[in-house]
Amino acid sequence: MSSSLWLQCLQRLQEELPSAEFSMWVRPLQAELNDNTLTLFAPNRFVLDWVRDKYLNSINSLLNEFCGGDIPTLRFEVGSKPISAPPRPQRTAADVAAATSAPAQMQARQSLHKPWESRGPEPVDDLNHRSNVNPKHKFTNFVEGKSNQLGLAAARQVSDNPGTAYNPLFLYGGTGLGKTHLLQAVGNAILERKPNAKVVYMHSERFVQDMVKALQNNAIEEFKCYYRSVDALLIDDIQFFANKERSQEEFFHTFNALLEGNQQIILTSDRYPKEINGVEDRLKSRFGWGLTVAIEPPELETRVAILMKKAEDHQIHLADEVAFFIAKRLRSNVRELEGALNRVVANANFTGRAITIDFVREALRDLLALQEKLVTIDNIQKTVAEYYKIKMADLLSKRRSRSVARPRQLAMALSKELTNHSLPEIGDAFGGRDHTTVLHACRKIAQLREESHDIKEDYSNLIRTLSS
């Protein structure tokens, strides 16, 4: 009874939730039904709290639908069911194909439950153990928002359960969005709990350089020994492996060895794994074996929170209206925000003036002028039309077909977010539409970004293109 009931719930939740969200929070749950009480077992307290906070109503609603009036009491526990493994939703044809294409060793690896601990032997010669983890990058000073919430949660889970939670963890997104911060925060969290752990952070180019040096020195076995003995390997900008065939070959075998040993791998890239050109398909396939999470450009509230946090680090007072002024005009990434604030703070220190909106406008005049020049309604319209492969004339027309109406709504929402034009001005630019039409479009897109993974992804891609 418990298996079939929870299986029904799983199948429905899998249909309703984005795949990454389902894989991270719902799939790990195990279920047991005793005396009309359905107990859901979560792997740790973090998952338990998240599921109870985010999905309790949905689960109760499904139980009501599937059980009629005889609804079991729902309770949560940290741990695992004492008997068989949790039920899984029925696999699709794509799932089966992916599973059968994976090598047998991957299936064997998934059945291993080795304790996570430091592995020897010690590295030799100039491949001395170096973590390279920046101690300043921690979870405590990472500003959370909707744009990075899933990535932060995944990183925390990996740091709590390295080698078992999500392996590999693949974070992707544009420059300056916090991927490196999260990567190193995991490393710091692991080292805080296990100071002797072999945690190695590096840019992908360093892996290539180490391999080349090992080949030159006839020390490739030492190179393999070093990289395959780490407890956690954190590699930034994996896209730089593109077209480096020997490096990809060596990393392929290192990757397999680490996964078989339940050693944690975390990778970052500026794009989705399958979109990385010049990297072998077998590697791209493995990048997706664990959990793949997008880190998106921060929304307005998160940008403001980042500015306030950085101002606090500088020990200066930043008025709310000043933070909003900067955040509304600089939207592309966190690094740009930090650079702008650093310039404002430096100017204030040099001149002794108070940080007001007028002062910020003066200190950042070239940067703000460039942003206003780059992001115009016309530019947004052209970018959206090109992205969806429709004609500009159709985008501005009265046509209501879905293939045109949705891109038009997206373009209106982007115009509202990325420019300082009023709703009537935006409506005017879209064929003389009323401001209420623009308002409806903005609300509709905001709703769809919550409900549709595709719309959310398209919106993020367009923001990235327009802000680059």
From Swiss-Prot:
What is the primary gene name for this protein? dnaA
InterPro entries named in the record: AAA+_ATPase, Chromosome_initiator_DnaA, Chromosome_initiator_DnaA-like, Chromosome_initiator_DnaA_CS, DnaA_C, DnaA_dom, DnaA_N_dom, DnaA_N_sf
* Keyword match Nucleotide-binding: yes
List, alphabetically, the PANTHER family matched.
CHROMOSOMAL REPLICATION INITIATOR PROTEIN DNAA
Answer whether the UniProt record assigns the keyword ATP-binding to this protein: yes
Q: What does this protein do?
A: Plays an essential role in the initiation and regulation of chromosomal replication. ATP-DnaA binds to the origin of replication (oriC) to initiate formation of the DNA replication initiation complex once per cell cycle. Binds the DnaA box (a 9 base pair repeat at the origin) and separates the double-stranded (ds)DNA. Forms a right-handed helical filament on oriC DNA; dsDNA binds to the exterior of the filament while single-stranded (ss)DNA is stabiized in the filament's interior.
Domains: entry comment: Domain I is involved in oligomerization and binding regulators, domain II is flexibile and of varying length in different bacteria, domain III forms the AAA+ region, while domain IV binds dsDNA.
Q: Where is this region: Domain III, AAA+ region?
A: 132-348
Xref: Pfam families:
Bac_DnaA, Bac_DnaA_C, DnaA_N, Hda_lid
Q: What SMART domains does the entry give?
A: AAA (SM00382), Bac_DnaA_C (SM00760)
Q: Name one GO biological process term.
A: DNA replication initiation
The record's annotation in Gene3D superfamilies points to:
1.10.1750.10, 1.10.8.60, 3.30.300.180, P-loop containing nucleotide triphosphate hydrolases
Q: Where is the composition biased (Basic and acidic residues)?
A: 114-129
Region annotation Disordered: residue ranges?
Answer: 112-132
Question: What is the recorded name of this protein?
Answer: Chromosomal replication initiator protein DnaA
Which family does this protein fall into? Belongs to the DnaA family.
| Segments of this protein annotated with the region Domain I, interacts with DnaA modulators | 1-84
